[in-house]
Amino acid sequence: MVKIECDIPNSSQRAELLKHTSLIIWDEITMMNKHNLQAVDSVLRKIKQTDVPFGGIIFVGAGDFRQIPPIVRNGTREEIILSSIKFSPLWRSFQILDLIIPVRQQHDKEFAELVDKISNGTLETNEDGKVILELIKTTTDSDEWTRFVYPDIPHVDPSTKAKALLTLFNKEVDKQNENICDVLTGEYKTLYSHDELNESSDISEFFKDNITTEFFNQINFPNVPPHELKLKVGMECYIVRNLSPEEGILNNTQVKVIHTLKNLLHLRHLENGKIFFIPRITFSMVLKRKGIKLNRKQFPIRAGYVKTFNRSQGATLDRTGPDLRTECFCHGQLAVAISRVRTREDVLILTTQDKLDVYNRAITTNVVYAELLL
């Protein structure tokens, strides 16, 4: 049984803040594993010294169960479903308030209806069980796809503000980001991480003595910067960890590289224009099958021109391009990828010729787990 503990000492400043808290709002809560929610509930009961849900604090969770669920690494359909807060004992304590007006697509009703059908799993399928995406433009040309979202490449460095190309896998994100960054003006500066074995690794002494730094350097983990972080001045990136909530420097914050120093990055916040510095921080990675725990000290940013479907969840974009050459494999992925924009004119699907019908409409897989819908 999985158990996550949230250890906040009763005498700490954070506990004191929570003692006087009357409202907590948790956005995109449907992406959160139920064990995280239960850990928060447990610590709030302890701090408030009461046995009522969330210590009696009004708790508002915002999210959409039709979108991407919690990530369960190598999880089965059943494991993913059971990880949802909908299957937590706390679920019975919530009052459900439905939002029935499509705010994002309110000016394109046909597109809003298509998004709803995709999200609910009610879009008609063909004899192969695939959906046909009417209304949405398609291309099989990756250059056209890139220029749709970033039309000024290569003459002007593109802006990522309210724009993104979307793909399913981190490897493809890295590849497509590199393709775009290669044509940006300026020279690359490569910043190397410091990788070392965590002493709590469950491996033999022989393996500890013979494992090499080069082995560590080759390891790539989702949402962890690579050993070789290649940056250019003017390049737009996003932060991958919460660094300073007070300053608005959070996970997914979009930034522009102003200058690179040996131990600091000089960045500009794309939303508010503020300039700030960030240091390297330590990331912990676990290779479960090998019992290896790795610490990587690296700057917490990644190139931001291309993102995964998962990372785009919650964002409203002016223009986007979902890559459907590889088909969706989990609940809510297609709904998230298509629904980031306001109108059908703001999205262009990249696909392959064999995934188009005679009218050039995309044919693809839409995965919806009925158990997760309200």
What do these predicted regions represent?
Residues 1-374:
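RecA-like helicase/translocase P-loop NTPase motor core
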